């Protein structure tokens, strides 16, 4: 019995040695080192990937901020452009209104110019008629007045008020002043008073 146990212990020892030899001969250590290396490479790759992802996320956040700011700037520019467009439309409306007012004023001035031209033509026509009358009538009136003055011996003043008739009658013996308010008398009464100064004796 003891001999069997001793043999069993020897077998176990031999088996352990054999296993150690197998482990050493099967390059388990190199496999373990390779596994550790693989693990380290995987860890390094994980760290690198995580860093890359972090950078990508940071870039994405930065890009979103830049794009968001650009959108805000574009909205602000759009708002400013809309305000400018509204101002330009208002200016166009004011210009159109001014243009319409100017057109109305121009039309009014053209009508006034035509009216003034017509009035000028009428004045020229009247002036021509007056010139003709002056040429023909005034000398005749002067002649009649001179003849009247010689016959009646009455010399009238012409720088008096319109309703006052002033002058002098030169009689043979006496000079009689004349001062008649024609607004209080009829033309016949004035004529009779003047002729009363004239002697009918020849």
Swiss-Prot record:
Gene3D superfamilies: Ncd80 complex, Spc24 subunit. Disulfide bonds: none annotated. It is found in: Nucleus; Chromosome, Centromere, Kinetochore. Keywords: Cell cycle, Cell division, Centromere, Chromosome, Coiled coil, Kinetochore, Mitosis, Nucleus. This is Kinetochore protein Spc24. One of its GO terms (biological process) is chromosome segregation. GO terms for cellular component: Ndc80 complex; nucleus. Component of the NDC80 complex, which is composed of ndc80, cdca1, spbc24 and spbc25. The keyword Cell cycle applies. Signal peptide: none annotated. The lineage of its organism: Eukaryota, Metazoa, Chordata, Craniata, Vertebrata. The gene is spc24. Belongs to the SPC24 family.
